[in-house]
Amino acid sequence: ADRLHNMRTLSSMLPSKQYKIVGETLYIFAPLADRLGLNRIKTELEDLSFKYEHPDDYQLMLDNLKRSEMERDDAINDFTPAIREALDRMGVDYELKARIKSPYSIWQKMQRKNIPFEEVYEILAIRIIFRPRDRQQEIDECYRIYAALTQIYKPDPSPPALLCHETL
């Protein structure tokens, strides 16, 4: 919590102090937050570090995300009705959540793959959070939902990501 507060108030510190804190945050505290399952904190620490370490690139990511916002909204509006219809038909108690990749994460992918913003395709993800009817049958219900969704959208044949999730 102290580190997050320090990062949120970093602008009031001397640049030499900022540089030291940003380095520690990006290489020690953000990975630690990730290991502890504190994803929101990890993401905020990374983005704040990115903002101070690479201010021009950070601003460029924000500008690109703003510029592509309408396109993402259209994709959500086009993509989700069929999912809602299938889940409603199955009687699933669910919630759909859109997740936008963070500026730092987008920039990292661009650096790693040497690609422009327009070629980063995983900027938007839709999550289905459902409440299982019966805890004993939760895995079976996951497979039923998966089966229903693969009737609408064909699975991506690429191997699962490092976090062991698959995409449709």
Question: What is each stretch, according to the model?
Answer:
Residues 3-168:
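Nucleic-acid processing machinery
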